[in-house]
Amino acid sequence: MARIASVNIPDNKRVVVSLTYIYGLGPTMAAEICNKAKISKDKKVKELTDQELIGLRNIIESEYKVEGDLRREVTLNIKKKKDIRCYQGLRHIRKLPVRGQNTHSNARTRKGKAIAIAGKKKAVK
């Protein structure tokens, strides 16, 4: 397995597909990186030479924010929104959907498990 951006990418898959295993790289960016490195998109990772792998590593490290750096940036952005108490920050604090989704009937994933309401017991007749 080749190691790029501290991620083991699978050898038996095409380069474009393997690069998408790295957090922050999707299919479009992976294709763009292959074009910059002058590597065929149909080539498999195990067929790459050491020079091609080094070229891929250099391009990804110098031009793109991936893995730990990207995760850190996202969490800092969320923390900043929470600190300034903007609408999105408040939604994050309350653990509700942030981007305008309905919450009346859905949003169970974001809100967590349904909480039972303790109400009156029905009177026995």
UniProtKB/Swiss-Prot annotation:
GO terms for biological process: translation. One of its GO terms (molecular function) is structural constituent of ribosome. The keyword RNA-binding applies. Gene3D superfamilies: 1.10.8.50, 30s ribosomal protein s13, domain 2 (4.10.910.10). The keyword Transmembrane helix does not apply. InterPro entries: Rbsml_uS13_C (IPR027437), Ribosomal_uS13 (IPR001892), Ribosomal_uS13-like_H2TH (IPR010979), Ribosomal_uS13_bac-type (IPR019980), Ribosomal_uS13_CS (IPR018269). SUPFAM superfamilies: S13-like H2TH domain (SSF46946). It holds the Pfam family Ribosomal_S13. Keywords: Ribonucleoprotein, Ribosomal protein, RNA-binding, rRNA-binding, tRNA-binding. One of its GO terms (cellular component) is small ribosomal subunit. It comes from the Bacteria. HAMAP family: Ribosomal_uS13 (MF_01315). Belongs to the universal ribosomal protein uS13 family. Located at the top of the head of the 30S subunit, it contacts several helices of the 16S rRNA. In the 70S ribosome it contacts the 23S rRNA (bridge B1a) and protein L5 of the 50S subunit (bridge B1b), connecting the 2 subunits; these bridges are implicated in subunit movement. Contacts the tRNAs in the A and P-sites. Part of the 30S ribosomal subunit. Forms a loose heterodimer with protein S19. Forms two bridges to the 50S subunit in the 70S ribosome. This is Small ribosomal subunit protein uS13. It comes from Rickettsia rickettsii (strain Sheila Smith).
